[in-house]
């Protein structure tokens, strides 16, 4: 199962840029009319700007209200459309534990640590014919873990530092990839022991996506989550975790 955000990325990005351009030109006409004390130019510029902003806003909100929340099962892929190619994210493993780190210096959780292993893949089947084999650095990402009560948890710096002491490498979701390449990244969250129905949200961390029609970050749009239910446990020889309390 796969989901993509935003759908028809080249179209909606061009629509956004076109709306910005027309609005900017209209405002220049408005300013020209004000400077020349011309009511005609002022009305044309102001009316055009208001029409474009209102029309774009209605379309953006309409598409958002028609969206529905998605929770992808383990193994499902969430794609981010980078105009001429797609970067996919999928949960490949989960581990819950009360402490992380080497036996001589473990970091204990106030509740419990949840380690989520995410696979990041540059899907070579989604590139345009003219793209080539050059590396792509994904846009900035925001990551949170949510539970059944709507509580959100950011990655735990203490937990990730403890895991880093065991694994000896960190990496990030922003590592550049060539078409067909992939890597796995362990994300560590600290949650209360009563947290249930956990699901992972990975989304873009760019402010302009709020204004992109059909993007999950846009106003009133529903999110696409990666579910953790039935995820395989992370192999301990790869990521040795302390037993949970």
PLM region spans:
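Surface-exposed edge beta-strand/loop patches
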Residues: 2-66, 148-149, 155-156, 165-245
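Low-complexity, acidic Ser/Thr/Pro/Gly-rich terminal tails and inter-domain linkers that flank the onset
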Residues: 69-109
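Hydrophobic core residues within well-ordered beta-strands of beta-rich domains
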Residues: 87, 114-116, 183
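Primarily extracytoplasmic ectodomains and periplasmic/lumenal surface modules that are beta-strand-rich
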Residues: 96-100, 121-129, 194-196
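Short, solvent-exposed beta-strand/turn "edge" segments of beta-rich domains on protein surfaces
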Residues: 97-115, 128-134, 174-178
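A short beta-strand signature
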Residues: 109-126, 139-142
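Short, hydrophobic/aromatic beta-strand segments
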Residues: 126-141, 154-157, 197-201
């Amino acid at each position: 199962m796969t989901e993509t955000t935003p759908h028809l990325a080249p179209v909606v990005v061009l629509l956004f840029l076109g709306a910005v351009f027309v609005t900017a030109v209209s405002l220049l006409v408005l300013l020209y009319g004000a400077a020349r004390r011309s009511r005609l130019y002022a009305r044309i510029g102001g009316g055009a700007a208001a029409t474009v902003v209102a029309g774009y806003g209605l379309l953006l909100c309409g598409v958002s209200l028609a969206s529905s929340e998605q929770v992808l099962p383990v193994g499902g892929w969430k794609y981010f459309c980078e105009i001429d190619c797609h970067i996919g994210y999928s949960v490949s493993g989960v581990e819950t534990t009360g402490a992380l780190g080497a036996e001589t210096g473990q970091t204990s959780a106030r509740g419990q640590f949840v380690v989520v292993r995410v696979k990041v893949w540059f899907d070579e089947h989604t590139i345009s014919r003219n793209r080539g084999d050059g590396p792509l650095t994904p846009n900035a990402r925001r990551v949170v873990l949510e539970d059944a009560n709507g509580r959100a948890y950011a990655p735990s710096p203490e937990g990730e530092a403890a895991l880093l002491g065991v694994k000896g490498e960190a990496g990030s979701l922003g590592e550049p990839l060539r078409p067909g390449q992939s890597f796995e990244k362990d994300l560590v969250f600290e949650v209360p022991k009563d947290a249930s129905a956990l699901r992972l949200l990975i989304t873009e961390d760019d402010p302009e996506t709020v204004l992109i029609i059909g993007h999950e970050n846009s106003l009133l749009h529903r999110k696409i989550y990666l579910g953790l239910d039935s995820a395989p446990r992370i192999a301990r020889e790869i990521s040795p975790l302390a037993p949970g309390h």
